[in-house]
């Protein structure tokens, strides 16, 4: 990415990755401006159940602490920090659709929608309104390769921290004027840079909760928004009732914890859900979780090669090793994926992300 632009906006989250990104940008650009997104309000959003911790400021939600950390980072770098309230937009564009998906028996991924509609959508647009000629940066572990003036999303140097799975549903035009400062850095290097600058965030653990909401006991958290609806748990093969559950929307394919099946000798997994009858089906046979073919709908093309490759790499979840598969185009935005080796725990509502063999992201589709 050219550094002709004088101004770059960086999404400052209060974590180590965005902090080090801001530091690196400060060395390249005349003006760096931090932007912090406020996307969640516990009281306004009736967020009472499922908190993992309680502190003096915000119980369970890290938004308050994250903003304080972002301010410290901005002050230490001598850069301006803007706080942007996107609570209503996040609720309408990310959170409510997530709840509706759960009601349909799906397993949605709110982080993917957040990147498309909020971070690289509304926040990016907000920054362009302030300065139309500016660049936009985040602390994602991802890479942009410019080919024929087109930004192509690619796997970064630190493949263990690769976050392209969460970015693959962003529209390709949204990556114009976007840079990822950590593209060629390992996480250990990022933490060491933070330690050299005596930043508290140097050893801050990576966030694993819902995007901008924080750590939660997930099924309890969902009970803020979805009713308990008792139903039967049945054996997949015999169809015999073996227990009961609180509602099929609280469970996902492959889940083995929280099933209350302590009396059974073998470990069981969720293999199917019937949203109409509110029945949950489990099995102790992992073979029931394997699939060789999946369909991807609403496919978002980030890169359309002149000829579709005979083989692609596919992820059906973050941090999964990409699997070799064959690709069949059913329509412009519907694909059939056939894996070389069976994959486990495919959940409808998640995303399948495709890559070329040389690690360029083709895009993402809904499973």
From Swiss-Prot:
Binding site for ATP: 11-18, 37, 139
Name the record gives this protein: tRNA-specific 2-thiouridylase MnmA
Residue span of region Interaction with tRNA: 161-163
Disulphide bridges, residue numbers: 114-211
Family matches, as InterPro entries: MnmA-like, MnmA-like_C, MnmA-like_central, MnmA-like_central_sf, Rossmann-like_a/b/a_fold
Signal peptide: none
GO molecular function: ATP binding; tRNA binding; tRNA-uridine 2-sulfurtransferase activity
Entry's localization field: Cytoplasm
Primary site of residence: cytoplasm
Family: Belongs to the MnmA/TRMU family.
Keyword tRNA processing recorded: yes
Region Interaction with target base in tRNA, annotated ranges: 109-111
EC annotation from Swiss-Prot or TrEMBL: 2.8.1.13
Reaction catalyzed: S-sulfanyl-L-cysteinyl-[protein] + uridine(34) in tRNA + AH2 + ATP = 2-thiouridine(34) in tRNA + L-cysteinyl-[protein] + A + AMP + diphosphate + H(+)
Pfam family, one: tRNA_Me_trans_M
Coiled coil: none
Domain of life per record: Bacteria
Residues annotated as site: Interaction with tRNA: 140, 350
Gene Ontology terms: biological process: tRNA wobble position uridine thiolation
Top-level class of the enzyme under EC nomenclature: transferase
UniProt GO cellular component terms: cytoplasm
Function, in words: Catalyzes the 2-thiolation of uridine at the wobble position (U34) of tRNA, leading to the formation of s(2)U34.
């Amino acid at each position: 990415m050219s550094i002709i632009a004088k101004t770059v906006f960086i999404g400052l989250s209060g974590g180590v990755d965005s902090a080090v990104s801001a530091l690196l940008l400060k060395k390249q650009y005349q003006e760096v401006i931090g932007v912090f997104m406020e996307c969640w309000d516990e009281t306004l959003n009736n967020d009472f159940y499922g908190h993992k911790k309680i502190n003096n400021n915000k119980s369970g939600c890290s938004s308050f602490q994250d903003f304080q950390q972002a301010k410290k980072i901005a002050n230490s770098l001598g850069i301006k920090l803007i706080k942007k309230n996107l609570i209503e937009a996040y609720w309408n564009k990310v959170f409510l659709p997530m709840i509706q998906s759960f009601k349909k028996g799906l397993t949605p991924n709110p982080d993917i929608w957040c990147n498309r509609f909020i971070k690289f959508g509304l926040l990016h647009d907000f920054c362009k309104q302030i300065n139309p000629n500016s660049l936009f940066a985040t602390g994602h572990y991802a890479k942009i390769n410019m080919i024929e003036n087109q930004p192509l999303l690619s796997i970064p140097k630190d493949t263990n921290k690769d976050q392209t799975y969460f970015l693959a549903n962003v529209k390709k035009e949204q990556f114009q004027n976007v840079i990822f400062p950590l593209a060629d850095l390992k996480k250990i290097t990022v933490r060491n840079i933070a330690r050299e600058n005596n930043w508290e965030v140097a050893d801050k653990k990576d966030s694993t909760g819902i995007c901008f909401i924080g750590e939660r006991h997930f099924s309890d958290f969902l009970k803020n928004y979805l009713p308990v609806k008792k139903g039967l748990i049945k054996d997949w093969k015999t169809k015999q009732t073996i227990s009961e559950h609180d509602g099929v929307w609280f469970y996902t394919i492959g889940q083995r914890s929280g099933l209350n099946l302590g009396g059974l000798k073998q470990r069981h997994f969720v293999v199917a859900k019937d949203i109409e009858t509110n029945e949950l089906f489990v099995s102790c046979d992992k073979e029931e979780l394997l699939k060789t073919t999946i369909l991807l709908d609403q496919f978002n093309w980030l890169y359309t090669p002149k000829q579709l490759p005979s083989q692609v790499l596919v992820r059906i979840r973050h941090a999964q090793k990409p699997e070799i598969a064959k690709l069949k185009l059913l329509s412009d935005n519907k694909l059939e994926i056939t894996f070389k080796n069976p994959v486990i725990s495919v959940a409808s509502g998640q995303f399948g992300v495709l890559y070329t063999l040389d690690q360029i992201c083709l895009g993402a589709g809904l499973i």
